[in-house]
């Protein structure tokens, strides 16, 4: 089926979907967090403070009215427990202060807290954009993810986890999910706390007609974006068994598919490539990664119908 990734109308807006202020365990005030991202040219952010009783269940929305900058209310929610006994972490963007908190006092396991199936479903039903977070850092397994049927995305890159403990990737868990047959988009984030230099390393580029909370959330839910550490996608087309990629200058363009399937084009300062999709398992999934000469990557959301 013919497919064009960025065919919706609008412009690309740059945003961070995961970060913290001193309303939970971050260093900066919400206003200072916003100003830091504004200075780096971001168009929107969500401050996702830890939604725990010890922090009074914050949904952080600074009283800032800044032209051309959007702040999306959100939180990082927690409940017990993952297969390895770790606490669940779940992003929810577009959350309002009427959302009933789970019974989770702090970062310790609470066996009486709400299960992840119920929490993720309530968030989804409340209209939030829901994402699984840092799967490599907290040892998430495929079995864990099968408990969640109401999520939009998973972090493919978490900058804070990458620089603090070299556990910032979500690729392995993502591909297991896709191989299993579940559909899930991806996001790159900072998870910034500003105690160290953990900001401005992973973001999303969302295509939308306007930069507003409602429009950005709708575009996220519809998958009208890509994730990046630096490189940019210009366009991606699928037609008659061919995939065409247009991008900023990079060193590698990689198409990954079911199992171990992949196709790669390597060339200095390459800005386009055409791939024969007959080399990939049909009617499964594919996704595209580009890597620049600094090793920075950008990722598309998975394509399922090709």
Write out the residue ranges for each language-model feature:
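Hydrophobic, Leu/Ile/Phe/Ala-enriched alpha-helical segments that form helix-helix packing faces
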Residues: 123-124, 177-178, 220
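Short secondary-structure transition/capping segments
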Residues: 57-60, 143-145, 198-201, 268
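Short alpha-helix boundary/capping motifs
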Residues: 65-66, 151, 205-208
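C-terminal functional module detector
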Residues: 1-12, 30-32, 181-185, 190-306
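Glycoside hydrolase catalytic-domain groove-lining segments
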Residues: 172-183
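A metal-dependent hydrolase metal-coordination microenvironment
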Residues: 2-129, 133, 140, 147-149, ...
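Generic, low-specificity signal for short hydrophobic/alpha-helical stretches with a mild N-terminal bias
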Residues: 18-19, 136, 156, 198, ...
């Amino acid at each position: 089926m013919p497919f064009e990734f960025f065919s919706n109308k609008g412009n690309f807006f740059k945003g961070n979907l995961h970060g913290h202020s001193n309303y939970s365990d971050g260093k900066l005030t919400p206003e200072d967090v916003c100003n830091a991202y504004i200075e780096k040219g971001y168009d929107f952010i969500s401050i996702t403070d830890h939604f725990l009783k010890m922090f009074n269940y914050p949904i952080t929305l600074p009283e800032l009215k800044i032209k051309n900058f959007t702040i999306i209310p959100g939180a990082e929610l927690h409940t017990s427990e993952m297969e390895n006994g770790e606490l669940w972490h779940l992003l929810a963007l577009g959350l309002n202060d009427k959302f009933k908190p789970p019974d989770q006092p702090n970062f310790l396991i609470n066996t009486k807290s709400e299960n992840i199936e119920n929490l993720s479903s309530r968030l989804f039903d409340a209209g939030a954009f829901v994402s699984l977070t840092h799967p490599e850092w907290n040892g998430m397994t495929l079995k864990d993810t099968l408990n969640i049927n109401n999520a939009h995305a998973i972090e493919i890159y978490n900058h804070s986890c990458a620089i603090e403990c070299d556990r910032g990737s979500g690729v392995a868990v993502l591909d297991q999910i896709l191989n299993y047959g579940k559909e899930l988009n991806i996001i790159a984030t900072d998870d910034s706390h500003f105690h160290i230099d953990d900001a401005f390393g992973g973001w999303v580029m969302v295509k939308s007609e306007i930069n507003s909370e409602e429009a950005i959330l709708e575009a996220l839910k519809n998958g009208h974006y890509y994730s990046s550490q630096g490189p940019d996608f210009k366009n991606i087309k699928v037609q008659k068994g061919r995939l065409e990629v247009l991008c900023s200058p990079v060193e590698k363009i990689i198409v990954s598919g079911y199992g171990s399937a992949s196709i790669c084009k390597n060339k200095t300062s390459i800005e386009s490539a055409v791939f024969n999709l007959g080399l990939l398992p049909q009617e499964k999934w594919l996704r595209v990664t580009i890597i620049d000469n600094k090793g920075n990557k950008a990722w598309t959301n998975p394509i399922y119908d090709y």
